[in-house]
Amino acid sequence: MTLRPLHDKVILKREEVETRSAGGIVLTGSAATKSTRGKVIAVGTGRLFENGSVQALAVKVGDVVIFNEGYGVKSEKIDGEEVLILSENDILAIVE
C-alpha cells in the first residue's frame, strides 16, 4: 500500500536509536524510551494558506528528522510496519 500525504503532512518511519544507561548498559523494551528520530518516507504538496497559495515543505523524502511526539502525531500500521503521520510543524530539526 502506498500513502500520499496531503498538504503539510509528513510520513516517517521511526529510527531506532540504541539507548544506554549512565553506566553503559544497553536498555531495551520498556526500559528504553521511544526514539523521536525518523526518516521521511513521504511528504505532502505543501502548506495551504487561506488565499489559496501553497508553500513547499522544508523537509524532503530521505531526510532524518527529530520530531515532537505529541497530540498531533498519528501512528498507523501499513503492511505490517509502523509509520507516523504528522504535520511539518511537529518536526523540530533535520539531522545533517
UniProtKB/Swiss-Prot annotation:
Q: Which GO terms describe its biological process?
A: chaperone cofactor-dependent protein refolding
Q: Name one Pfam family in it.
A: Cpn10
PROSITE patterns for the chain: CHAPERONINS_CPN10
Q: Which InterPro entries match?
A: Chaperonin_GroES, Chaperonin_GroES_sf, Chaprnonin_Cpn10_CS, GroES-like_sf
- Any one GO molecular function term: metal ion binding
**Keyword Cytoplasm attached:** yes
Q: Which UniProt keywords apply?
A: Chaperone, Cytoplasm
Keyword Cytoplasm in annotation? yes
Record-level GO cellular component terms: cytoplasm
Where's it found, cell-wise?
Answer: Cytoplasm
For this chain, the family text in UniProt reads: Belongs to the GroES chaperonin family.
Q: What's its job? A: Together with the chaperonin GroEL, plays an essential role in assisting protein folding. The GroEL-GroES system forms a nano-cage that allows encapsulation of the non-native substrate proteins and provides a physical environment optimized to promote and accelerate protein folding. GroES binds to the apical surface of the GroEL ring, thereby capping the opening of the GroEL channel.
Quaternary context: Heptamer of 7 subunits arranged in a ring. Interacts with the chaperonin GroEL.
Alphabetical list of PANTHER family matching this protein: 10 KDA HEAT SHOCK PROTEIN, CO-CHAPERONIN GROES
Per its record, how is this protein called by name?
A: Co-chaperonin GroES
What organism, scientifically named, is this protein from? Actinobacillus pleuropneumoniae serotype 5b (strain L20)
Taxonomy of the source species: Bacteria, Pseudomonadati, Pseudomonadota, Gammaproteobacteria, Pasteurellales
Gene encoding the protein: groES
